[in-house]
């Protein structure tokens, strides 16, 4: 048998069968190494807030407006820059608004002006890419014309006349609007080369399904799963306890529309059961979070909220007892209730319950679902497993996502790396074996994927159960607290019972040796390596910059519920050829305001790490892959020249 290296070169020779083809590819790849590094955009904790997320995606955390300023900063007024930026963000809506204010001749002139401006921004933004990469980004309908307009043509003497003729033709034949829309959608793609989503796409907002659709159409991205994403993944895999958690969170925030309208999940059996079981119950402990005034559906939603919460507590008790290694016996609380006194025993103390109406709880077997509850969960499970759109979204999360990512010297994850008080890695038991640090992440991810893809029923069940543990487990890297005090927050008035103690990780992030230890664990070390961390909102007075800039906490703060705590809408990060930029955003008002007034999200740069020289593709992970490819092609070239492999002309 031939050595594997020789077999590999023979396979490579099928793609590059001649010396000329091989040499050309080496030259092409070598030239790419010297191009400027593309811009990376880091967003986290979207929490289902589609409008705000969509706007940040369109404006690249200010990167698009920055490009416009670089092109026109000395020639356009601030008003004109805002108009052009709005056109890039919302081309169709902006053109419809302008059309209402201008006659046909004025509109044609406006089209011409905007076309020239958009072409200039496209040309400037595309300067760091190869023609091949630009062609792949171009919209098919206008690919040839756009390439002509944004590419310098040295063979044409009257360039201005050439471009003017193209623009006039576009306007004359009535194709200005779709062409402007195509250019506007191209610009953000050219400005931001790659997108990183650091978790929690799902949660309380009502647009998570639309966010997933948007991400699925994105040209280049990766996802680090958040705790809210993982519980949805568990639900889609058929975990009943995860399904109950998902439905409860949606009910708690008045967001059942994501389930019913977004995914077509039939909640009628649950609603019918809730009305029949809790019809006379005011369910006052189950008021909706963030609801400013009651609607005609409020009473029903509160009953649904209570019904699914009780089911959740039962299912969690079942799994806590079935999986004692998870260490979640403390979440099984129903058997600790004294139904006569209306109290619950917790940590050696007795607390009065705020709600004592539990008609479906069997005093002798409190974690057993009633027959009706079993039927409700059976219907919900079938709906989650049978929802094509949900399964498609979860498959995308699995294919493009992971628990962490190492990218261009940065370690990206949601939550925390579980640590002991002394800063060493916490030892975590996962199905009979101890894991810590990177090995813990890798092992957990294996079980997550088994929940969906394993053909072994036991492995699939282990995967489904571990998804719930990742959602709320004490040592879970995505949860990072000693308990999820859901029961206590509903039923107990005493605030001390609501406390969820955070993992020591969060208090140790300013220790250089801790940050360096985490980075080394994931294969990173050096001056320009960072931890980029999502999950925890940065409160007023706190800094997102930890450990002298080694750790960047970039909770996007899209959730309106947290904006009163943070005082802003959150942080995002960009990383381009000149360095890193941490940007703080003010809350987004609405898409309507952005279109009608040109209002953008007000962003303020709070940190810049500038490099002494401009980074190139050669300085990135892609550059490392390209150098490996060049080395392989060079070996093939040598094999052709020394006669080891024959050319196939």
Q: What is the meaning of each model-derived region?
A:
Residues 1-649:
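Feature recognizes metal-dependent phosphohydrolase scaffolds
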